[in-house]
Amino acid sequence: MPGGISIHVYDVSRGVPAAGLRVELRGPDGKLLVDAQTAKPGTLEGPTPLTGAYEAVFHVGDWYRAQGVALPTPAFLEVVPYRFGIADLAQHYHLPLKMTPWGFSLFRGGA
C-alpha cells in the first residue's frame, strides 16, 4: 500500500479492536484534516499526506466510558496526542495504537 496514512487502534486490556474511537488528524499547517471514528476493526484511513509534521489525537477517555469501563475522575488518560513527521510521500505511514485506560504504545507500523 504505497503512500498515505492509516491508523489501527487496539484495546490490549480487553483484547478488542477500538471500534468507534474518535480520532482527529491535523496537517502540517495545523488544519483539521480528519475528525472521525475508527471502523469496526479499529481502523481509520487518513488522507494522502504532504511532507511535514502531523498530529493525531486519540480520545481514549470518552471511548472507555462509552464501553462501560469505570474510570477515575479525572481519568488517567483522557486524550493521547501523537506528533509524527512525514518525509517520503512514496512510503505508507501506519500508526498502530495499543492502549489500556492506564497506558499506551504508539509506533510506526509496517502495514
Language model region names:
Residues A87-A111:
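Compositionally biased low-complexity segments at domain edges in trafficked proteins
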Residues M1-D88, H94-P96:
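Beta-strand-dominated extracellular/periplasmic modules and repeats
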